[in-house]
């Protein structure tokens, strides 16, 4: 009898793998059959900022409206001019930190001067791609992955004037939530994460509660594309996270006066609507991960072992890449 049971086990594993492969392929077909416009809610609010606006005023607008990014508009050319994100404010902080004598320049900086800041501190600008809202959703996902961005602007064109129209901005989170809400196939994604090769485990940056905020900001700048730094205790156990968007709340009271604060002190100023730290283990399944995305506003999962030690990071970009390109 034991020998017979052993023979059945590989078949069970093969079934799980086959079901996952077919499920991913089905989700991919779903993404190809839908447009970016299909993801948008029936009604929504969109904040678009003119490139002549002062950076400090744009920060206040983002905070007052509880958003972390906004499309930019060049009134002179009547064209979309990029996206304003927390990374732009981090770049300005870096510039001011290394050039304290330029305080007045930073205080009068307009949004159209952010590219000059990038060049001054040696930051490679992001490739901000856009897409027409009626193009396939799959195409929008691929463009996001190729440009290393977590969001993509949807740009239409007025038929009479031929001028561009900013329709909305689509995020990886919104796309994956759309998948989780509409694709029943996710229940077949039962392979453990450790088998999928989608967890980042090498060179995971971290900090502690006592780490100066400016050190964490420098980590966010140097890493490129990283939007958060996990906070661990002396033993390496995960206790919290410092996100790029936390920088916005830190500098709202003045122009970068509190960079000497520790991470722990800075977190005291965090907004009350912080979603929390989401964790998983390498034994969790994508089905449960996407179920969490369906229920909660989550942007990444920190992978921990059974004792709570940080072992890796699983981003929404990692999940999206797997759905787009794996199991083909």
From Swiss-Prot:
Encoding gene, per UniProt annotation: SNF4
Source organism per UniProt: Kluyveromyces lactis (strain ATCC 8585 / CBS 2359 / DSM 70799 / NBRC 1267 / NRRL Y-1140 / WM37)
Primary role: Adenine nucleotides-binding subunit gamma of AMP-activated protein kinase (AMPK), an energy sensor protein kinase that plays a key role in regulating cellular energy metabolism. In response to reduction of intracellular ATP levels, AMPK activates energy-producing pathways and inhibits energy-consuming processes: inhibits protein, carbohydrate and lipid biosynthesis, as well as cell growth and proliferation. AMPK acts via direct phosphorylation of metabolic enzymes, and by longer-term effects via phosphorylation of transcription regulators.
Residues at which ADP 2 binds: 150, 227-228, 315-318
Ranges for domain CBS: 42-103, 123-186, 199-259, 268-328
InterPro entries according to UniProt: AMPK_gamma/SDS23_families (IPR050511), CBS_dom (IPR000644), CBS_dom_sf (IPR046342)
Binding site for AMP: 150, 227-228, 315-318
Top-level taxonomic group: Eukaryota
Assembly and interaction partners: AMPK is a heterotrimer of an alpha catalytic subunit, a beta and a gamma non-catalytic subunits.
GO MF entries: AMP binding; ATP binding; protein kinase binding; protein kinase regulator activity
Entry GO CC: cytoplasm; nucleotide-activated protein kinase complex; nucleus
Keyword Nucleotide-binding: yes
Keyword presence, Iron: no
Family: Belongs to the 5'-AMP-activated protein kinase gamma subunit family.
Pfam family, one: CBS
UniProt name for this protein: 5'-AMP-activated protein kinase subunit gamma
């Amino acid at each position: 009898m034991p020998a017979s049971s052993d023979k059945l086990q590989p078949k069970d594993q093969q079934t799980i793998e086959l079901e996952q492969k077919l499920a991913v392929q089905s989700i991919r077909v779903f993404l190809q059959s839908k447009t970016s416009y299909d993801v948008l809610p029936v009604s929504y609010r969109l904040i678009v900022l003119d490139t002549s606006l002062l950076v400090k005023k744009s920060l206040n607008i983002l905070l007052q409206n509880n958003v972390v990014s906004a499309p930019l508009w060049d009134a002179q050319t009547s064209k979309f001019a990029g996206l304003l994100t927390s990374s732009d404010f981090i770049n300005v902080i870096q510039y001011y930190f290394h050039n304290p004598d330029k305080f007045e320049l930073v205080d009068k900086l307009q949004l159209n001067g952010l590219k000059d800041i990038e060049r001054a501190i040696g930051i490679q600008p992001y490739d901000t791609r856009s897409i027409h809202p009626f193009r396939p959703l799959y195409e929008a996902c691929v463009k996001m992955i190729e440009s290393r961005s977590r969001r993509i602007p949807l740009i239409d064109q007025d038929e009479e004037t031929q001028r561009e129209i900013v329709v909305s901005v689509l995020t990886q989170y919104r796309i994956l939530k759309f998948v989780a809400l509409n694709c029943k196939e996710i229940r077949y994604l039962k392979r453990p994460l450790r088998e999928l090769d989608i967890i980042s485990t090498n060179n995971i940056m971290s900090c502690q509660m006592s780490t100066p905020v400016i050190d964490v900001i420098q980590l966010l700048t140097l890493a490129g594309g990283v939007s958060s730094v996990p906070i661990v205790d002396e033993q390496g156990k995960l206790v919290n996270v410092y996100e790029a968007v936390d920088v916005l709340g830190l500098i709202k009271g003045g122009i970068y006066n509190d960079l000497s604060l520790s991470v722990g002190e800075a977190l005291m100023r965090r907004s009350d609507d912080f979603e929390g730290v989401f964790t998983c283990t390498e034994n969790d399944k994508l089905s449960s991960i996407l179920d969490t995305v369906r229920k909660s506003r989550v942007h990444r999962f920190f992978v921990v072992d059974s004792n709570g030690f940080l072992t890796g990071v699983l981003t929404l970009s990692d999940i999206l890449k797997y759905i787009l390109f794996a199991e083909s």
